């Protein structure tokens, strides 16, 4: 199985030691977000976990812990955007995140690193020209450290409406203009540009619309073949294989205004007060009321050819 860590929160930024403790203990407990008393227990060992998928805005706190997971294949999605504190209040400067990206890429390989420039948000300050210039500078800085960049436009989920009411999706004409320019920049820096959750409308512009976190992504990065259980897509326009996430909603303190995973800051702060690095759960501890279901996951590898390089 692939251990997912980034659909609900940012574990490398805020909960790295907790993850390392779970790996040392050999299992992790995950609450069902819709039924908190229902808990799934996933084993964490190399016989079952084929790799760990990360999605983060700030890898820097986790870098000192990377030696602890050197024996696991890794696949990183790292969001690097040019927004200020008006939109991303507690995300480090993009220059520092780029350095973190490069550091990890050097230890793994460029195929295991994905740069996310999303969501694309337009305001009076963050104009089309601003985005094109920012994307160009970042692409040049990341050239050779990744072969993939993922982009998308703002999705208007309920929590986004609540926390970012002025957010909107630009017209299709403007989206097309941006994607066309981004594809050109990406290709000139030896990157494949993928769209996330945008359907196939940008395929004719040269964008890869086949999904940004598919089994093919893992297979290409890790030089293996996988056979995974069939899963329904998270939404109709998404081809990604999302499974086994160990995070929890309402626990990310980046407080990005466009976030779909946080209700509000008060809930996040309350939950973080109940985080224990030694707990089997990300938030809180087990009581006697939970029903624990042991996961029956197994390795998905059917033909391993080459293991992921590591220079640790």
Model-assigned labels for residue ranges:
Residues 96-162, 180-197:
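Conserved C-terminal portion of the radical SAM core fold
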Residues 38-41, 136, 244:
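A generic local structural motif
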Residues 1-87, 94-97, 101-110, 265-312:
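Conserved Radical SAM active-site core
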Residues 83-91, 119-129, 163-171:
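Surface-exposed cleft-lining segments at the edges of enzyme active sites
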Residues 236, 244-264:
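Local cysteine-cluster metal-coordination motifs and their immediate loop/turn environment
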Residues 160-165, 169-244:
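A conserved mid-domain beta-alpha-beta active-site/ligand-binding segment of alpha/beta enzyme cores
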């Amino acid at each position: 199985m692939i251990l997912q860590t980034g659909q609900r929160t940012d574990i490398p930024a805020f909960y790295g030691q907790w993850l390392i403790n779970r790996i040392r203990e050999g299992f992790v407990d995950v609450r069902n977000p819709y039924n908190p008393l229902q808990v799934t227990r996933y084993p964490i060992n190399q016989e079952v976990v084929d790799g760990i998928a990360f999605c983060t805005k700030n890898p820097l706190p986790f870098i000192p812990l990377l030696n602890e997971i050197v024996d696991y294949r890794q696949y990183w999605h790292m969001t690097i955007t040019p927004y200020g504190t008006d939109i991303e209040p507690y995300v480090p400067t993009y220059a520092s995140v780029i350095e973190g990206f490069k550091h990890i890429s050097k230890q793994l390989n460029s195929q295991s690193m994905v740069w996310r420039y999303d969501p694309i948000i337009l305001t009076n300050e963050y104009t089309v020209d601003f985005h094109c210039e920012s994307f160009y500078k970042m692409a040049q800085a990341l050239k050779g450290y990744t072969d993939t960049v993922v982009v998308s436009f703002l999705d208007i989920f309920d929590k986004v409406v609540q926390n970012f009411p002025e957010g909107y999706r630009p017209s299709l004409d403007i989206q097309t203009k941006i994607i066309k320019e981004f594809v050109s920049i990406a290709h000139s820096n030896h990157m494949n540009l993928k769209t996330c959750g945008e359907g196939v409308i940008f395929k004719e512009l040269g964008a890869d619309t086949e999904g940004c976190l598919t089994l093919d992504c893992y297979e290409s990065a890790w030089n293996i073949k996988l056979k995974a259980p069939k899963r329904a897509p998270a939404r109709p326009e998404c081809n990604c294989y999302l499974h086994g996430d160990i995070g929890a909603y309402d626990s990310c303190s980046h407080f990005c205004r466009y976030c779909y995973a946080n209700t509000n800051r008060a809930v996040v702060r309350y939950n973080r007060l109940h985080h224990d690095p030694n707990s089997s759960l990300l938030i809180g501890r087990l009581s006697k009321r939970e029903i624990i279901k042991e996961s029956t996951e197994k390795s998905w590898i059917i033909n391993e050819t080459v293991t992921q390089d590591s220079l640790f």
